[in-house]
Structures are given as C-alpha cells and as structure tokens.
C-alpha cells in the first residue's frame, strides 16, 4: 500500500449525500454522524488541505415522490435546494463545535442565514484555510447536487471531487444485489460511460470529464477512509482521463 508523508491533494471538493447524514434513522440528521464527519474534515484541515463541501438534501426532502403526485418539478427542486441549506447549517455548526473555521454559502440569497455564493470569495476563504460549505445546489432547478459538486469543483479549481457514498467504490454491478460484483480501483471517463456504471448523473459526469476533473468514489462510513484517500492510499475508485 502506497503511503505518502504528505497529502496528494491541496484542494478538494467533498460531496456528501444527504442520506449519509441520516444514519440508521432513515430521515433527518444523526448528530453523531455529523460530528464524526466534522472531525474527519478537521483532520484534513490540520493536514493543510483546503476543503470545499457540497451536501445533498435527500435526508430532509425528496422531490421525486411529490413530482409523481403532481407537484411542479421547479417547486420541488427549490424545496430540495433549501434542504441542502439546512444540512449546510448543521454541518457548519458541527465544524464550529470542532473548532474549525467554516463558512456557509448559498447559491440562492438567504440574507441573515448564510452568505451568497461568490466564486472569488470562496477561493479566498479556502486559501485562508476556511472550510467552505456550498449549498443550494447550482441555484437552478433540474440540476442535481452531483452537478453542483462538479460545477463548484471546477470553479474553485479543486484537484479532485471526492464523492462519499455508502459503498467502497464503483463496482461491476450493485454489490447489494450481486454478491459476485467486484470493485474497480481505477477507471477512465470513457470506461464509465461505455460500461454504463452508475457514478453520477450524466450531466454531472460529463461536466467533470470535459474539464478533466478527477472523481474518487469512496465509503465515508468507513472510519479513516477520507484521510486515506487524501494521503494517496488505496481507497475507493479513481476516475480520470
């Protein structure tokens, strides 16, 4: 196993799913998981890594079901964006309690709650070792938080998007349904598309590919996995050119 004395990334974009925050409850935010994630992010900051974070909102709101029931998709997506802001507030609070300087930015203006998203301000904060939480997706309906992660990753000039999931990486098939599924250590963007592997939605994935932004998929539920990823150890699946 390769072990580096120094991190292999200087600036990362960490994509957390909303579901990752809910733990075994099935809904809402599990405070113990939130605090563990804050501690893992703190470790990265102490290593000198600049950290941007995008969080989904699926633990608080899922628009798909309501869309089927007749709700306007734009309204549902706006509600989903607000759910990501709520998760961002919780993460900012957890980081502050862990004595980590963190700033929450939103793609839709919410004066008095958090800062408006500014690309230049985000980069300035990162350079000053502040964790920047980027909420409300892209600010537009019809785009996922994976798209937001890739877009913000490109904007802040991140070295990589680290997509935290509930599985160890990208597999040949769904490991929950197929016990013979094996995990890929590395893939190219083309291989992911050819094999129709579920990494991200197509809009997000092609955005990353077109801008040569590497993606690493790993299991955030595995203690220490995030640190191992940034130290260049064998963890998860790396997707590059």
Swiss-Prot record:
It is found in: Cytoplasm. This is Uridylate kinase. One of its GO terms (molecular function) is ATP binding. InterPro entries: AceGlu_kinase-like_sf, Asp/Glu/Uridylate_kinase, Uridylate_kinase, Uridylate_kinase_bac. Residues 23-28 are annotated as: Involved in allosteric activation by GTP. It comes from Klebsiella pneumoniae subsp. pneumoniae (strain ATCC 700721 / MGH 78578). The keyword Disulfide bond does not apply. GO terms for cellular component: cytosol. CDD domains: AAK_UMPK-PyrH-Ec. Catalyzes the reversible phosphorylation of UMP to UDP. Its main location: cytoplasm. GO terms for biological process: 'de novo' CTP biosynthetic process; UDP biosynthetic process.
């Amino acid at each position: 196993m390769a072990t580096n004395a120094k991190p292999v990334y200087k600036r990362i974009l960490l994509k957390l799913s909303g579901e990752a925050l809910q733990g075994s409850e099935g809904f809402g935010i599990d405070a113990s998981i939130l605090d563990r994630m804050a501690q893992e992010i703190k470790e990265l900051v102490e290593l000198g890594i600049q950290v941007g974070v995008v969080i989904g909102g699926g633990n608080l709101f899922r628009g798909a079901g309501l869309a089927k029931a007749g709700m306007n998709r734009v309204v549902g997506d706006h509600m989903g964006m607000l759910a990501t802001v709520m998760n961002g507030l919780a993460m900012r609070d957890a980081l502050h309690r862990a004595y980590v300087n963190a700033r929450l930015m939103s793609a839709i203006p919410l004066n008095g709650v958090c800062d408006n998203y500014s690309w230049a301000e985000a980069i300035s904060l990162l350079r000053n070792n502040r964790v920047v939480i980027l909420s409300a997706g892209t600010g537009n309906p019809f785009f996922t938080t994976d798209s937001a992660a890739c877009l913000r990753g490109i904007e802040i000039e991140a070295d990589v998007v680290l997509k935290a999931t509930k599985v160890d990486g990208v597999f040949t098939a769904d490991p929950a349904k197929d016990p013979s599924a094996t995990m890929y250590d590395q893939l190219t963007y083309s291989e992911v598309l050819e094999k129709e592997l579920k990494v991200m939605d197509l809009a997000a994935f092609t955005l990353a590919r077109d801008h040569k932004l590497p993606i690493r998929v790993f299991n955030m539920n595995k203690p220490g996995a995030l640190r191992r990823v940034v130290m260049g150890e064998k963890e998860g699946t790396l997707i590059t050119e």
